Amino acid sequence: MNKTTLHDQWVVKAPVNDVFEIMTDFEKFPKNFPKVAESIRVNRRVGNYVEMEATVRSFGKRFQVKMNYQILPGKGFISDNDSYQFGTSGHEEMKLCQHPKGTLIDYTYQVTIHNKWLGIIAVPLLRWYSMKYWEKAVIDQLKKILEK
């Protein structure tokens, strides 16, 4: 198994609660962030815990992901994800806090690649490409929605 941690931070010129509302409205992800989410089905919601399945896009492919989210009210979320089809699993954290210019998004994704040979190729590619793609597909889109 190969593991890598991806991390970045961005500032969005909007209040924390506005960012939180969009980033935890999972059912609207396909509409708000079509470059990464094709479809999402919430299977179970109990309090701040959400179990869902999604068809996501990455590296020019579509694949299924099972996600278990813990919503941190007003602060972001923590998620454990399993992409059995792509051969990866991950632990994702998105934390929000006030910033003089709006909201600071602190995003970390710890990825485990279960296929040894895929890991040799994928780890360098993930480190180089993933956060740039996430910024373009999610953060830039979030800014378009909120910074009108």
PLM regions: where:
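Hydrophobic ligand-binding cavity/cleft-lining segments
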Residues: 1-47
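Hydrophobic-ligand binding "helix-grip"
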Residues: 45, 57-106, 110
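A generic structural signal for ordered secondary structure
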Residues: 6, 50, 70, 137-139, ...
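Short structured motifs
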Residues: 5-6, 36-39, 51, 78-80, ...
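Residues that form or flank phosphate/diphosphate-binding pockets in enzymes
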Residues: 14, 87-90, 116
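A conserved amphipathic terminal alpha-helix motif
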Residues: 111-148
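Generic recognition of short, well-ordered alpha-helical segments
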Residues: 24, 64, 91, 120-121
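Hydrophobic pocket/interface hotspot
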Residues: 19-23, 29, 52, 69, ...
